[in-house]
């Protein structure tokens, strides 16, 4: 695994406790730094206090930009990665025209794996380090997502979606098939 140390300079803001505790709940460094190694944040704080400890770090300067590490998405659908922004007049139109046809492909392990890798990389690229993600009715989709998340040591809750009505037959489960595949 890559042992390069990355130092990101900018305005660093993160929560360390419940936001209900107001002033005690966060840390803010107007001239801050995040230090990352092997995909993990190993230190955050004032740039002046950190920079000398990492002389070999690859530095990216985001001065004037807000850096917020460790976002958590508590409701996201990984199978919808390829249809972000698709228009639908109503939810049912959108499900029938885009969602269901897209989700039918997730029975293919190779396809599910490609989308899972894209999905996890997009989460990280946007600062999300943990999530609760919906998969599809296909066990292959769940296995692919767990596999990629594990490879990156990402904290994730996910599981097989169970559908037994209001969807195409190819996406439906019975109680027995849902239990067998879970």
Regions found by a protein language model. Name each.
Residues 2, 88-93, 151-157:
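Short coil-to-beta-strand
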Residues 90-141:
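Divalent metal-binding segments
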Residues 72-74, 131-133, 156-160:
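Hydrophobic faces of well-ordered beta-strands that scaffold small-molecule active sites
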Residues 5, 58, 129-130, 155-157:
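Structural motif
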Residues 140-182:
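Metal-coordinating catalytic core of metallo-dependent amide/deamination hydrolases
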Residues 1-53, 65:
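N-terminal metal-binding scaffold of metallo-dependent hydrolase/deaminase domains
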């Amino acid at each position: 695994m890559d042992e390069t140390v990355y130092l990101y300079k900018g305005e660093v803001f993160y929560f360390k406790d419940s936001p209900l505790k107001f002033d005690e709940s966060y840390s803010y460094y107007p001239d801050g730094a995040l230090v990352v190694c092997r995909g993990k944040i190993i230190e955050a704080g004032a740039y002046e206090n950190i920079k000398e400890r990492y002389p070999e770090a690859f530095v990216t300067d985001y001065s004037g930009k807000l850096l917020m590490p460790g976002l958590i998405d508590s409701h996201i659908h990984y199978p919808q990665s390829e249809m972000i922004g698709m228009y639908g007049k109503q939810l049912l139109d959108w499900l029938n025209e885009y969602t269901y046809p897209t989700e039918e492909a997730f029975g293919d392990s190779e396809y599910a794996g490609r989308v899972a890798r894209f999905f996890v990389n997009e989460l990280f690229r946007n600062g999300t380090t943990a999530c609760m993600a919906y998969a599809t009715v296909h066990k292959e989709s769940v296995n692919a997502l767990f596999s990629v998340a594990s490879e990156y040591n990402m904290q994730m809750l996910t599981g097989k979606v169970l559908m037994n009505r209001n969807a195409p037959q190819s996406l439906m489960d019975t109680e027995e098939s849902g239990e067998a595949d879970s």
